[in-house]
Amino acid sequence: MTALGALSLPLARAHELTGSSRHALALLLAAATEGPVLWIVPAWAPGRLYPDSVAEWIEPGRLIQATPKRAEDLLWCMEEALRAGVVPVVVAELPAPPPLTPVRRLHLAAETGASLGRCAPLGLILSTGSGGAAGVETRWHMASRHGPGITAWHLERRRARLAPPRAWRLSRDADGRLSLDPALLEPETAGA
């Protein structure tokens, strides 16, 4: 799956999104697909997606929210949705990065979904802090760099099996169009 011509994420795999703008990054990636987006968030989480902010990225009617009551059900929901292969994007907000075995199960479920379902699903794990989910296909970090009259983000690919670390400046012009320009890695955020 490619977004904005340069952001490439292999389908039928699980990817980790981190940083203060990880929700916006998930919505940006969802905008590059068609069909429903399943967003899994813990029932005890204090915040929910705001429809007006969702509308900046995708049609809010595409969004389906699941709110499991138990922590172990978050990954179960994600795994089953990926295995079904009927939802192109499955997002899970997790309280902590999952270990290797559950991530491997997500990859296998997504591969099964791609072979049996109607689409090759994209699994997005949203982690707080710098993340650290073991075994993810890629790890991305996005943080806002807004200023007076400027809507911009710093986006990094921090880990990928088949690509080196890289950074971009993502910006939105006054007409709402997004542009992606190469950026230098900032030393204080590089790594992980």
Cite the ranges covered by each PLM segment.
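N-terminal regions of ATP-driven nucleic-acid and macromolecular assemblies
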Residues: 1-192
